[in-house]
Structures are given as C-alpha cells and as structure tokens.
Amino acid sequence: MISTADFKNGLTIEVDNAIWRIVEFQHVKPGKGGAFVRSKLKNLRTGAVQDKTFRAGARMEQAPIEKSTMQYLYADGDSYVFMNTETYEQIEIPGDHIQDELKFLKENMEVQVTLYKGEVLGIDLPNTVTLEVAETEPGIKGDTASGGSKPATLETGAIIQVPFFVKAGDKLIVNTVDSTYVSRA
C-alpha cells in the first residue's frame, strides 16, 4: 500500500480495478477544508487519460509492473510475436494493444514489453530507430539542408516529414516519440 504522499510521475497504482500510471500530480492545501491531491492518470489497459482527485493521505495498492526486453519476431495475422531475450519464451500481442508502435516496428527489433501479472499492457520502442526510405519525391537541384521538408514513406509504412535532400533508399534515424526525422544513418 502506498499513500498520496508517495506519488511521483511514472508510478503505477491500482484504483477501481484498473491499472493507472501517474502522468502528473499536484498537492493542494485550500484555505478551508482538508488537503487533497489532484492527479492526471493514464489507464494502461485502454490508454485513456483521466483526472482524479484523492484526499491527502489516501492509501491504494501499487501495481506490480514488470518490464521485459523482448525481440519482435514476426506478424501472425492480427497478432505480433515477441520473444523474451533471456528465457526465449514467445508471446503473442494483439495488434490493437500496440497500434501506435506498429509504424516503427521492424523484425528483430528489441523493445521493452510492459507486463502486469503476466498480462501484456503495451510495448516501449527505443527512442530512435534506423529505417530505410521506401518512397519519396525526388529532390530538385539546389535543395539544401536548411530548406523545407517533404513527406517520405519508410519501410514500415510510416510517413514522416524529411528534408528535401533525402531520397529513396536512404537510411534515416527517426525519433519514435514524436515521429520526426533526426538525421541520416
């Protein structure tokens, strides 16, 4: 059991039979009445973000979240197969659990899988990945690094904005957090 005094960003708690990650929180002491904690929580099963208020000193269960390093092997219909790099155990994750991450997921990529009592809650990609440009408009003579940008389709199907000098076949380093071009690989 933990108290609201132990709150910190990233902590996972169990409230109302749901697993929540604390996104942000604030201790409030009004001039009249008891103190309370205003928090923004993200449901790890559904991804929904919700504001919740707890009275100061309220106690709740800390959710035992595990993170395992796993390697993405292949897609199997609507599921994706990952292998634990330590035990070589394979698990299938439904595509709807990892919809946002699919655009940067490549075979043999290592990811962090978030588990709660054996249930997969999601995956965390590395902050940057190296991907090849599958298709983009050809550059025009005189394009410079300081110019604008154009859309490019990557090998995984993701579409990002890249500088004019990038051409099909180039390998790029892409930020997976905000889906932006970082540099050439």
Curated annotation (Swiss-Prot):
<dbReference type="InterPro" id="IPR011768">
    <property type="entry name" value="Transl_elongation_fac_P"/>
</dbReference>
<comment type="function">
    <text>Involved in peptide bond synthesis. Stimulates efficient translation and peptide-bond synthesis on native or reconstituted 70S ribosomes in vitro. Probably functions indirectly by altering the affinity of the ribosome for aminoacyl-tRNA, thus increasing their reactivity as acceptors for peptidyl transferase.</text>
</comment>
<dbReference type="InterPro" id="IPR008991">
    <property type="entry name" value="Translation_prot_SH3-like_sf"/>
</dbReference>
<keyword id="KW-0251">Elongation factor</keyword>
<dbReference type="InterPro" id="IPR013185">
    <property type="entry name" value="Transl_elong_KOW-like"/>
</dbReference>
<keyword id="KW-0648">Protein biosynthesis</keyword>
<dbReference type="InterPro" id="IPR001059">
    <property type="entry name" value="Transl_elong_P/YeiP_cen"/>
</dbReference>
<dbReference type="Pfam" id="PF01132">
    <property type="entry name" value="EFP"/>
</dbReference>
<dbReference type="InterPro" id="IPR020599">
    <property type="entry name" value="Transl_elong_fac_P/YeiP"/>
</dbReference>
<dbReference type="InterPro" id="IPR015365">
    <property type="entry name" value="Elong-fact-P_C"/>
</dbReference>
<dbReference type="InterPro" id="IPR014722">
    <property type="entry name" value="Rib_uL2_dom2"/>
</dbReference>
<dbReference type="GO" id="GO:0005737">
    <property type="term" value="C:cytoplasm"/>
</dbReference>
<comment type="pathway">
    <text>Protein biosynthesis; polypeptide chain elongation.</text>
</comment>
<protein>
    <recommendedName>
        <fullName>Elongation factor P</fullName>
    </recommendedName>
</protein>
<dbReference type="GO" id="GO:0043043">
    <property type="term" value="P:peptide biosynthetic process"/>
</dbReference>
<dbReference type="InterPro" id="IPR012340">
    <property type="entry name" value="NA-bd_OB-fold"/>
</dbReference>
<dbReference type="Pfam" id="PF09285">
    <property type="entry name" value="Elong-fact-P_C"/>
</dbReference>
<dbReference type="Pfam" id="PF08207">
    <property type="entry name" value="EFP_N"/>
</dbReference>
<dbReference type="InterPro" id="IPR013852">
    <property type="entry name" value="Transl_elong_P/YeiP_CS"/>
</dbReference>
<comment type="similarity">
    <text>Belongs to the elongation factor P family.</text>
</comment>
<keyword id="KW-0963">Cytoplasm</keyword>
<dbReference type="GO" id="GO:0003746">
    <property type="term" value="F:translation elongation factor activity"/>
</dbReference>
